[in-house]
Regions:
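Conserved mid-core segment of classical short-chain dehydrogenase/reductases
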Residues: 123-127, 134-145, 149-153, 160-188, ...
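Canonical Rossmann dinucleotide-binding motif of NAD(H)/NADP(H)-dependent dehydrogenases/reductases
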Residues: 74-110
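C-terminal helical subdomain
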Residues: 194, 261, 279-314, 319-323, ...
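Short C-terminal tail/terminal secondary-structure segment
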Residues: 315-347
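Catalytic loop of short-chain dehydrogenase/reductase
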Residues: 86-93, 166-254, 263-269, 292, ...
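Conserved glycine-rich Rossmann-like NAD(P)H-binding loop of the short-chain dehydrogenase/reductase
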Residues: 106-122
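A short C-terminal helix-loop "cap" of Rossmann-like NAD(P)-dependent dehydrogenase/epimerase domains
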Residues: 127-128, 274-289, 338-346
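Hydrophobic structural elements of the Rossmann-like NAD(P)H-binding subdomain
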Residues: 84, 162, 216, 259-262, ...
Length: 347
């Protein structure tokens, strides 16, 4: 049966969560108008004035979609509390995960290094989501203790945690893999992987994560395949995935806590911008993946399901969110792009 309108009442009732700064009266009027977006088949029946209003609403709707503000919520995290590590700015996947978690009914605490909080936009996100911001260096156990203690003061035990932390000085300095600076390599490991172990160890000792809770860390397929330019970050991601399995067994056995990693498509982020050839890799992955690249919004949605009770028996897994890229060998689009490039080189 065809729909008369593009959005139903139930689909727009979730919008107030995304617009807490707008007065209730204006917001209710906006939601009412949004319900009047017609299905395409009804467009010819609309009057001229109504069409003008609809046109404005389509522009607003496009803006919301572009900003990742959805008109659908399932309350998957209603009543749940969480900690998001690693949000820096709107380019961060962790930023979008934080927004989606709140849209789905959760209360959260945001954390990043003091420098990142000062130089980035985390305080703005905290204000928008009504979330406390706790500066902390995830490589230091005492500062991690402060984060979890603050969360427990605010919420009691937390239900979910996101680890979205990664940085390689060798990549930033343009060092080749066969010419690494080993002090910088250790820094890569400490920030990108060992911080995950420290986070889990501190949480377990404090008994900070509730029974049946969920921990997710973000990773990349370079942990298992060779990608030129990803450098020592590939080694760090391999370690990260191993920690998820090893700690997943212990935390699951003792406390029923789930630990998984999400292997995300190449995504434009502040951290990823330092990887040589990133834009070409994005194009290649888009051509190779049958569903195309998964973007930050897709990753956030996947993380939400892993935080929810719907995935209560999933743990110690490395889960690909990449449009099918990880299972592909070659696609017609990739072959065509390669052939075109070769033909251009031979001219």
């Amino acid at each position: 049966m065809s729909r008369k309108y593009l959005y139903s009442r139930s689909e727009v009732e979730v919008l107030p969560r995304a617009f807490s700064g707008i007065s209730g009266g204006i917001l209710r009027y906006f939601c009412l108008l949004l319900q009047l977006l017609p299905a395409e088949s009804n467009w010819q029946k609309m009057g001229a004035l109504h069409k003008k209003r609809i046109f404005v609403l389509y522009i607003i709707n496009g803006y919301l979609t572009d900003k990742g503000i959805t008109t659908m919520s399932y309350n998957l995290l209603a009543g749940k509390k969480g900690i998001i590590f690693g949000a820096l700015n709107e380019q961060s996947i962790a930023w979008r995960v934080a927004e989606r978690a709140v849209e789905e009914g959760a209360e959260i605490i945001l954390t990043n290094t003091a420098v990142a909080v000062r130089m980035g936009q985390l305080n703005e996100l905290g204000q928008k989501l009504n979330a406390k911001v706790v500066p902390a260096d995830a490589t230091k156990e005492d500062e991690l203790e402060v984060v979890f203690q603050e969360a427990m003061k605010s919420f009691g035990k937390v239900d979910f945690v996101l680890h979205s932390i990664g940085m390689s000085p060798n990549v930033r300095k343009g060092r080749a893999y066969d010419d690494l600076d080993y002090k910088m390599l250790q820094t890569t490991f400490d920030i990108s992987a060992v911080s995950f172990h420290k986070m889990l160890q501190v949480a377990k000792k404090l008994d900070a994560i509730a029974e049946g809770g969920s921990v997710v860390a973000l990773t990349y397929i370079a942990a298992q395949r060779t990608f030129v330019g990803y450098n020592d970050m590939a080694d760090a991601k391999s370690l990260l995935e191993s920690i998820a399995r090893s700690f997943g067994y212990i935390y699951g056995r003792d406390k029923g806590v789930r630990i998984n990693t999400v292997s995300q498509s190449p995504t434009v982020t502040t951290a990823g911008s330092g990887v040589k050839g990133m834009s070409d890799l994005l194009d290649f992955a888009e051509d190779l993946s049958p569903l195309g690249n998964a973007d930050a919004n897709d990753c956030a949605d996947y993380c939400i399901t892993l935080f929810s009770d719907l995935t209560r028996k999933i743990t110690m897994q490395n889960l690909f969110n990449d449009g099918g890229f990880s299972s592909m060998g070659m696609s017609a689009a990739a072959i065509e792009a390669f052939a075109t490039g070769r033909a251009n080189r031979e001219k």
